[in-house]
């Protein structure tokens, strides 16, 4: 072993012994930096015992320190990973974190302080390469998130201002590391068949970390090449199915064919569509129109179902809560008391959550399909994803992509700056392209603009403005943000280059924390009561207390001066407030005189003579009483009319029901009267002489004959008339007969 190798090994042992004595844990150091005060000054100054003994053999101390720290981290991580134990892994990560913090805290003591940035990036990249699984990567990653400002310092020894970064993508130390980390991301992207949830979590955190390292105006931090993403199709084999010969033209096959045609000819190639001929645009329109009709029809059913469910829920809530609206969405369910105190329930609950946690932890390592990806190659799955009414995620995703694409096409056709920018970027990436950017006539431009406006404005935005205003506002804001981002991209993000955050410290606001005693509520503790007994000096302030009598005299003097001057000046701005203050002062002494005060007189009403109120005469009282009781009388009249009408209807119904009885009664009366008449005649014949009876009969017959009209002819001419009248009105006939019988009876009685 050479002297240098022995020096390195001894230095590593020295660091292990020194770092092991620090009172710090892995959970604390990965979230909070290690303060420099915890490390001895000799350690930070590189006054290590092995180095002091061989100081003559050291030519480049900074390079030697870098080698020692790298070997220290590699040894710590290798031993921890080989043991495959949780405690050893945390010990290795703890040593690595302490080593990185040591580089930062000792940056001023280097021969070349600017070299600390390269060392920090190199050691950090070494640790990332040694983490052999996503779980260990995620365990260590809070350290990188908590030290993001250290990375932005680059080679500077002073911290950068908030929002700024000294890193440049094409310069060290980030240049090589950025390429290496992009290769890691590419491997994760290409190896998605075997990726688990933690792989995707690791990929997201690394991408987010790289985007935060560089400023926003850095070319590597945005899509400077203006390339269009075509990554909608899932690369995961779990979302694919074996292709079969599609002989039938079912609805799912037609739907999938139209969707794929629109996706490959419009969404992922807006530049080709914008500068294509009319036939190409018409072909896309023929596939897009029925596809959009079908999707919007399903969306309409989706919102109708939501509206119906809400109406049902609201009706139930209204029926249950007639006076109060119950918002059950904000109510937190409470656990019943018997479940809280039941040991059996507690054991079952703990077992359930333990099993659920185990399932979740084991599920992180399980291969699974990416369910949020659209399966373009699976016809049945694609049809179900976009036509399922209960799930609108995939439809909303397609609608957003369609709006962004049509909006970009409109900008390409109408804006010369946008067209020139995308043209230069496209030709730089595809120099052999056959797109003719200059051969776009007015008819073709008009057709493209009309098609994009019809799809985006007339179909999509108008539909969601009525059905879903919230999503409509989301689309509008995203489109506006996309236009602003495109404008900034064309300008090279120059507006962010001059963006500087002020380095002046904002002084904290001064608070008066002195206590002023205004009131006091007695507490049960005497010590607390004594705290309130603080001499504030408020009791020593001399303040003249106003008495009600003095205020009354001042108000009266003011009123008298107003009367004597006979001037009605304009009311002061705060006159109402002053009068209220005066009344508050007078309340304790002159409360029973306040009946003289009203809105018109104000305080002056206390001193004015009370006006005599004219007594109301009897006629006025009667009119007033009549007006008050008018509505009551109207209700009484309506009630009487209702009662009379009800009685009339009842009487009419009774008469209709009693008509047959009346008719029977009349007939019986007629028979009785006839029989009585015959009996009287027989009796009279027996009592009177025969001569008198004959004379009477003669008189009656002569009178009957004389009563007939001599011009009427034979009496038989009148028989049909009487018969017809009798047929037309049989009741009249019966009445006449009864009348005649009664008259005959009476005449018979007279004769008798």
UniProtKB/Swiss-Prot annotation:
It comes from the Eukaryota. Residues 720-752 have a biased composition (Polar residues). GO terms for biological process: DNA recombination; mRNA 3'-end processing; mRNA export from nucleus; positive regulation of transcription by RNA polymerase I; positive regulation of transcription elongation by RNA polymerase I; transcription elongation by RNA polymerase II; transcription-coupled nucleotide-excision repair. One of its GO terms (molecular function) is nucleic acid binding. The keyword Transcription regulation applies. GO terms for cellular component: Cdc73/Paf1 complex; chromosome, telomeric region; nucleoplasmic THO complex; THO complex; THO complex part of transcription export complex; transcription export complex. Residues 692-702 have a biased composition (Basic and acidic residues). It is found in: Nucleus. It holds the Pfam family efThoc1. Residues 648-752 are annotated as: Disordered. The modification Phosphoserine is found at residue 234. HPR1 is not required for sporulation, and is not essential for DNA repair. It is probably not a DNA topoisomerase. Component the THO subcomplex of the TREX complex, which operates in coupling transcription elongation to mRNA export. The THO complex is recruited to transcribed genes and moves along the gene with the elongating polymerase during transcription. THO is important for stabilizing nascent RNA in the RNA polymerase II elongation complex by preventing formation of DNA:RNA hybrids behind the elongating polymerase. This is THO complex subunit HPR1. It comes from Saccharomyces cerevisiae (strain ATCC 204508 / S288c) (Baker's yeast). The gene is HPR1.
């Amino acid at each position: 072993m050479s002297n240098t190798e022995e020096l390195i090994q001894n230095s590593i042992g020295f660091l292990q012994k020194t770092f092991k004595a620090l009172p710090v844990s892995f959970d604390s150091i990965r979230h909070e930096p290690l303060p420099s005060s915890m490390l001895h000054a000799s350690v930070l100054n590189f006054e290590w015992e092995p180095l002091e003994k061989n100081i003559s053999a050291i030519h480049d101390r900074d390079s030697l320190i870098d080698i020692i720290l790298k070997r220290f981290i590699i040894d710590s991580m290798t031993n921890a990973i080989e043991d495959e134990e949780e405690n050893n892994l945390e010990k290795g990560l703890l040593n690595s974190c302490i080593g990185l913090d040591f580089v930062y805290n000792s940056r001023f003591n280097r021969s070349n302080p600017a070299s600390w940035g390269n060392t920090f990036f190199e050691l950090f990249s070494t640790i990332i390469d040694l983490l052999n699984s996503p779980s260990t990567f995620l365990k260590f990653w809070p350290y990188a998130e908590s030290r993001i400002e250290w990375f932005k310092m680059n080679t500077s020894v002073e911290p950068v201002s908030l929002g700024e970064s000294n890193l440049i993508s094409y310069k060290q130390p980030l240049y090589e590391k950025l390429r290496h980390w992009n290769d890691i991301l590419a491997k994760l992207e290409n190896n998605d068949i075997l990726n688990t949830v933690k792989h995707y979590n690791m990929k997201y955190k690394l991408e987010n970390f790289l985007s935060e390292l560089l400023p926003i105006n850095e070319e590597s931090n945005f899509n400077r090449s203006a390339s269009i993403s075509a990554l909608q199709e899932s690369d995961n084999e779990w979302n694919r199915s074996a292709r079969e010969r599609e002989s039938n033209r079912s609805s799912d096959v037609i739907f999938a064919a139209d969707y794929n045609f629109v996706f490959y000819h419009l969404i992922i190639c807006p530049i080709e569509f914008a500068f294509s001929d009319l036939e190409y645009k018409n072909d896309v329109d023929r596939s897009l129109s029925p596809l959009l009709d079908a999707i919007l029809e399903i969306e309409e059913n989706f919102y109708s179902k939501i509206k119906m469910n809400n109406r049902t829920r609201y009706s139930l809530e209204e029926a249950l809560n007639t006076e109060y609206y119950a918002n059950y969405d904000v109510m937190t369910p409470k656990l019943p008391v018997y479940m809280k105190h039941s040991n059996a329930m507690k054991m079952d609950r703990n077992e359930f959550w333990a099993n659920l946690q185990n399932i979740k932890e084991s599920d992180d390592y399980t291969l699974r399909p990416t369910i949020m990806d659209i399966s373009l190659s699976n016809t049945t799955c694609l049809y179900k994803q976009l036509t399922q009414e209960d799930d609108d995620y995939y439809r909303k995703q397609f609608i957003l992509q369609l709006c962004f694409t049509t909006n970009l096409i409109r900008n390409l056709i109408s804006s010369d700056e946008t067209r020139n920018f995308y043209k230069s970027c496209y030709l730089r990436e595809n120099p052999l392209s056959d797109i003719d950017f200059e051969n776009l006539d007015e008819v073709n431009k008009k057709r493209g603009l009309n098609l994009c406006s019809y799809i985006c404005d007339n179909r999509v935005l108008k539909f969601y403005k009525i059905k879903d205003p919230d999503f409509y506002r989301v689309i509008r804001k995203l489109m506006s943000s996309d236009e602003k981002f495109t404008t900034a991209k064309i300008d090279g993000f120059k507006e962010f280059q001059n963006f500087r955050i002020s380095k002046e410290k904002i002084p904290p606001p001064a608070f008066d924390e002195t206590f002023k005693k205004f009131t006091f509520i007695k507490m049960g503790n005497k010590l607390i009561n004594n705290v309130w007994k603080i001499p504030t000096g408020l009791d020593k302030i001399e303040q003249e207390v106003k008495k009600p009598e003095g205020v009354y005299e001042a108000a009266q003097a003011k009123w008298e001066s107003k009367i004597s001057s006979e001037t009605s000046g304009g009311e002061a701005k705060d006159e109402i407030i002053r009068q209220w203050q005066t009344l508050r002062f007078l309340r304790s002494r002159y409360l029973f005189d306040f009946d003289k005060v009203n809105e018109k007189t104000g305080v002056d009403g206390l001193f004015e003579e009370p006006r005599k109120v004219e007594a109301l005469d009897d006629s006025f009282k009667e009119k007033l009483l009549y007006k008050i009781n008018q509505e009551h009388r109207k209700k009484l009249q309506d009630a009487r009319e209702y009662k009379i009408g009800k009685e009339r209807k009842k009487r009419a119904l009774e008469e209709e029901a009693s008509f047959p009885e009346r008719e029977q009664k009349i007939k019986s009366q007629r028979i009785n009267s006839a029989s009585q008449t015959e009996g009287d005649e027989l009796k009279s014949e027996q009592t009177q002489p025969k001569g008198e009876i004959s004379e009477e009969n003669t008189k009656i017959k002569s009178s009957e004959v004389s009563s007939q009209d001599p011009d009427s002819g034979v009496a038989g001419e009148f028989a049909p008339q009487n018969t017809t009248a009798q047929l037309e009105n049989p009741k009249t006939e019966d009445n006449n007969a009864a009348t005649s019988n009664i008259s005959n009876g009476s005449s018979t009685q007279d004769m008798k």
